[in-house]
Amino acid sequence: IHKVFGGKLNLIICGGAALSVQTEEFFENIGMNVINGYGLTETSPLLTANKINDKKIGSAGKVIGGVELKLSKQKEVLARGKNITPGYYKNPSATKKLIQNNWLHTGDIGEFDEDGFLFIRGRVKNMILKQNGMNVYPEDIEKILDKEQLIKESCVIGLNKGTDVIITAALLLSKKASNKEIQKVIDKTNKKLEFHQKIQEFIVWKKKDFPRSFSFKVKKVDVQKTIESKT
């Protein structure tokens, strides 16, 4: 494997989309150091980073010097520091949404562990709020589903039905399967989830792919609208 990468690569610095723990562990186990960080274009761009001798797999690292981070009541990551943009050029309305009370709202949900490492859980806009007040982060469920061979990709959303919000998994299958086979995957996944996270229904996505943005991210709003229009 080292030869494929030229034989001299021993350090990988990773940013952008979230790196799966499985991928990070793979490269660590073959002797390559993986340094994961987190930030936004609007933060020039770094907020947190792991170090070679101070890191945790699955985390985005610790807050870098000159930056302050805190979590809102929703656990959204808020940031301030000299590296933070003053705003969007000639777009005061977007700037007002981005920066409130001198804190930049990242739109990401995070948690700090006892050692100060930041773990990104998902996006605020994707969070599902159950009727009992419990927050469900679709990314936590999708990570488990997407490891199943039968599942090419999943998109978890919350559908309002009656007095509750139903956790629904839209599934792109890697091959044809019966509802019974799919339900086995759902049951297996649910065993790994907390009660409020459990998938309550699934829908097989019939098209070749989910609707995507220019950055290839699944457009959850469009997926939800499509499903709601058929129910």
Describe each region flagged by the PLM.
Residues 13, 35-36, 48, 68-71, ...:
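Structured core elements
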Residues 71, 81, 87, 109-195:
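AMP-binding/adenylate-forming catalytic core of the ANL superfamily
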Residues 39-43, 106, 131, 213-215:
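Ser/Thr-glycine-rich phosphate-binding loops at phosphate-binding pockets of nucleotides
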Residues 1-55:
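Gly/Ser/Thr-rich phosphate-binding loop
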Residues 155-158, 188-231:
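Conserved C-terminal "lid"/linker of ANL adenylate-forming enzymes
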Residues 32, 59, 63-65, 72-98, ...:
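Conserved ATP/PPi-binding loop(s) of AMP-dependent carboxylate-activating enzymes
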